[in-house]
From Swiss-Prot:
Positions bearing Phosphoserine: 8, 10, 37
Region of interest (Disordered), ranges: 1-45
Post-translational modification (record): Proteolytic processing into mature chains is required for histone eviction during spermatogenesis. Transition proteins (TNP1 and TNP2) are required for processing.
UniProt name for this protein: Protamine-2
Function: Protamines substitute for histones in the chromatin of sperm during the haploid phase of spermatogenesis. They compact sperm DNA into a highly condensed, stable and inactive complex.
Length: 100
């Protein structure tokens, strides 16, 4: 299950433009200290969560489906997603799943 939403490329230029406009307005009002505003921090956190949410998955759903399509149900239950705590990656177990 994917928890994080990745922004589409069409949304990024608009967001960058807003940040640029906000930065220019801050400069006009005489605020010399330019730290990350609350909006900037929030956006920064969101984009990085979206990025790392996808990197945590070791196998894509499509690949898991393709690998386990012709296997027994017991093998399908023990796919790499459920063995994260004890094993790292798909290729460590070769006895039950030959196609990993």
């Amino acid at each position: 299950m994917v928890r994080y939403h990745v922004r589409s490329p069409s949304e990024r230029p608009h967001r960058e433009y807003r940040q640029l406009v906000n930065g220019q307005e801050q400069g006009r009002h005489g605020q010399e200290e330019q730290g990350m505003s609350a909006e900037g921090v929030e956006g920064y956190g969101r984009t990085h969560q979206g990025c790392y949410g996808y990197r945590r998955r070791l196998c894509s759903r499509r690949r898991l489906y393709r690998v386990h399509r012709r296997q027994r149900r017991s093998c399908r239950r023990r796919c790499c997603r459920y063995r994260r705590r004890n094993r790292r990656g798909c290729r460590t177990r070769r006895r039950t799943c030959r196609r990993h």
